[in-house]
UniProtKB/Swiss-Prot annotation:
Pfam families: Lipase_3 (PF01764). Its EC number is 3.1.1.3. It comes from Eremothecium gossypii (strain ATCC 10895 / CBS 109.51 / FGSC 9923 / NRRL Y-1056) (Yeast). It comes from the Eukaryota. The gene is ATG15. GO terms for biological process: multivesicular body membrane disassembly; neutral lipid catabolic process; pexophagy; phosphatidylserine catabolic process; piecemeal microautophagy of the nucleus; vacuolar protein processing. Keywords: Autophagy, Endosome, Glycoprotein, Hydrolase, Lipid degradation, Lipid metabolism, Membrane, Signal-anchor, Transmembrane, Transmembrane helix. PANTHER family: LIPASE ATG15-RELATED. This is Putative lipase ATG15. The active site is at residue 362. It is a single-pass type II membrane protein. Residues 1-45 are cytoplasmic. The chain crosses the membrane at residues 46-66. Belongs to the AB hydrolase superfamily. Lipase family. GO terms for molecular function: phospholipase activity; triacylglycerol lipase activity.
Length: 544
């Protein structure tokens, strides 16, 4: 029994010891698995960290390479691959000014008109008339301006634009800003980023084509065509009245469009004057052109000296001018700025789905810039006088803190043009002798300047202002387009004192301590008072 007992106990103990060993082995295996799992987790985490670091490095390298590739594409590939199409003249607009300011006529250009215009232009060219209005170089020399096809390239750009920059809002806003500029400054517009198609101003052919469109606006029109009145003003336009676009009472613009009407270019005509060669004949709109030039680009109504006849009655005394009067004169319904706004609205109504660009030469370029500023659309100008002062006087909207690269107004010019550079002033200048007070030099937007004085040895001369000289001898001749950069800080008419109202106050509302009421502003189109007499020094001695 002892043996049996010992044997049973041994077997039972063995079973217990075996179970314990197995449990130990199991625990050891489980512990090993946990350690292996921890090791695998750590390795996986390290691998992910390494991948993240590598991904970040690749992203940085890719971003740098992509930025360079994008810049190359914008300057090379985009220029070749963003063809906006072939543009032709599709409409001619005439807007009356002065007593005829309610007239707005539109001529739709068709095949019959092109044929008649080509025949008349050939006669003009044969007799040497208007030969300075159309470029003479290359394939354009024998081209018919009314049938010429222009090549433009576009690119999509991000611009800053207000939601309110539409005709329904802007004109009432400008009228309100004219009467109460202090309150208008408190109106906060909803500025935001917007993608739109703009002209590719790095492409040489595009810049030349826009300059040609500006030149086309000068070319004489035949006295025929089916003009239609697009205003509510009831008038009959018959016979010789059809050629209103060429008399002294109007502003003209030519409208160009591509094949699918997705892009439309509005080219505004510039100044016609014999003293400005290459800008039209002296009897074509010259009187009102000169008046609007002196309003837009002088410090105070073209008051250069007591010998000058002013174009408005805002001058008070030596180097003192009534600012509210100047603003009212610019906003009058019979001035060119209002005519430009009406033309843009009509083009927008007839081409509602198109991207609208503006261009022009000289006065036409300045007007194109002002209209573009009003509605937040692109404009490319050529040899335009400084229009920044007019932009401020008209209270045109400017986005706060606008980055320079987002501006869509480009001014092309060269250093030998005294009008573009703002040096055509002074008693002995050609502009002053001809009665033009071109006293401004500051431009808004970007300036694209060809330094022909240093590059080509040109001398500053008014003859270099003409459009076909710019196209034939500069835009065509230079290998690359001039770089467009923001202009330096500039101030026009710094020595003038501008008072808000004629009695010297700066606010249209009377203050609490005022001893007499402040004059209220008059409606646009009429100054607050009229000077009836001045003394020898130019001081106004009697008011109407």
């Amino acid at each position: 029994m002892v043996a049996d007992f010992d044997s049973g106990w041994y077997e039972g103990a063995g079973d217990e010891l075996g179970q314990g060993a197995r449990n130990g082995v199991l625990r050891e295996r489980l512990g090993g698995n946990e350690k292996a799992q921890v090791v695998r987790s750590r390795r996986k985490a390290v691998a992910w960290n390494v991948l993240m670091v590598l991904g970040l490095i690749l992203y940085v390298l890719y971003s740098a390479c992509f930025a360079q590739a994008r810049q190359w594409w914008r300057t090379n590939g985009m220029a070749r691959g963003s063809q906006a199409g072939r543009f032709q003249l599709v409409q001619v607009h005439h807007h009356g000014v002065g007593a005829e300011h309610a007239t707005h006529l539109v001529l739709d250009v068709d095949a019959e008109f092109r044929k008649e215009a080509a025949a008349e232009y050939s006669v003009f060219a044969l007799h040497g008339e208007g030969q300075e209005l159309w470029p003479e170089a290359g394939r354009r020399r024998a081209a018919n301006p009314f049938e010429y096809a222009y090549a433009l390239r576009e690119e999509r750009a991000t611009v800053v634009r207000a939601q309110q920059q539409v005709p329904e809002f802007m004109e009432p806003y400008l009228d309100f800003a004219l009467e109460r500029p202090d309150l208008a400054e408190q109106i906060k517009m909803d500025w935001g980023y917007e993608n739109m198609f703009v002209p590719n101003i790095t492409d040489k052919e595009t810049v030349i084509s826009l300059a040609l469109m500006s030149s086309n606006a000068y070319v004489r029109l035949p006295n025929t065509g089916n003009w239609r009145n697009v205003t509510s003003w009831n008038s009959s336009v018959e016979g010789d009245q059809i050629h209103l676009g060429w008399d002294e009472n109007g502003l003209r613009a030519h409208v160009f469009a591509n094949e699918d009407r997705s892009v439309v270019v509005l080219a505004l005509k510039g100044t016609s004057s014999q003293v400005l060669p290459g800008s039209g004949d002296d009897d074509e709109t010259s009187a009102n052109d000169k008046l609007n030039d002196n309003l837009l680009f002088s410090c105070c109504c073209a008051r250069v000296s007591y010998l000058w006849t002013t174009v408005c009655d805002c001058y008070i005394k030596s180097y003192t001018c009534e600012e509210s009067c100047l603003e009212s004169e610019l906003r009058r319904k019979d001035r060119y700025y209002q005519a430009g706004l009406d033309m843009y609205k009509q083009v927008l109504a007839e081409f509602p789905d198109a991207s609208i660009w503006l261009t022009g030469h000289s006065l036409g370029g300045a007007l194109a810039s002002l209209v573009a500023r009003t509605y937040g659309v692109p404009a490319v100008t050529f040899e335009a006088p400084g229009e920044l002062l007019a932009t401020q006087r008209l209270h045109l909207p400017q986005p706060p803190g606008l980055p320079n690269q987002l501006d869509t107004v480009w001014h092309f010019g060269h250093t030998a043009d005294p009008i573009f550079m703002g040096t055509c002033n002074g008693a002995s200048s050609a502009c002053s002798i001809a009665g033009y007070a071109m006293e401004t030099s500051c431009h808004s937007g970007k300036s694209c300047v060809y330094d022909v004085v240093n590059d080509r040895g040109w001398r500053v001369n008014l003859l270099h202002h003409r459009i076909h000289t710019v196209i034939d001898k500069i835009l065509d001749d230079y290998d690359a387009v001039a770089a467009c950069v923001p202009p330096d800080i500039c101030h026009d008419c710094y020595n003038w004192n501008y008072v808000r109202w004629r009695d010297g106050t700066t606010s249209p509302m009377p203050s609490s301590v005022a001893s007499k009421p402040t004059p209220t502003p008059t409606s646009p189109g009429s100054p607050s008072s009229t000077c009836k007499g001045r003394n020898w020094f130019g001081y106004c001695t009697e008011y109407a």
